[in-house]
């Protein structure tokens, strides 16, 4: 997915540069990240690499650290500065739609990345099919449970499009299995500590379940850590989403038998 973003940005800017050979200028890309984590940091590094590959490009990075008010301010600042292209990963579905619309109406191309906003005033969306991800995980767990079992869900940020879509896909996948129940669902806000606290809340209510479906690997790891603190980590199967091929990432955790998937 990162490669597609990288490609569309530089094709677009390449065409602009070709059209402006007579008057070279700096093309400014404003990048508004909703949060900070391993894969977003990797994406930022790849985008910044563009400055070394083409000295006509300036990449400005901003992260709101899950703060809707701050992200609105950052996007509007990019608009006021007159950037040539905006790449935005909205924190929540409706939180920055007005700022996105303002940029688009000012004639600034807007690429929504990873997450959507509830407006149609944007140039392109690049992201994965989060509904399909949730449905695939639901199908996987249903098959592992052979149609009967109890699941707890640890969700991403309430109101964020990946959390909404992954939940919907998961629930649709297990709908044909009346013997499978989601007995608890807690928000973890995409953070490891959020996963810890969500799992602790669940374990206070009940310890009678089979699987943990977490909307991200960080949430799943937090849930695992919370269970481990109570000596319960071997009682449950943990699943997450991301599969980063880094130290401590999802692929390594599956390989080591900590995550089921």
Functional labels for PLM-detected ranges:
Residues 32-45, 60-70, 92, 115, ...:
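Hinge/beta->alpha junction and helix N-cap segments in small-molecule ligand-binding domains
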Residues 16-19:
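C-terminal motif of bacterial Sec signal peptides marking the signal peptidase cleavage site
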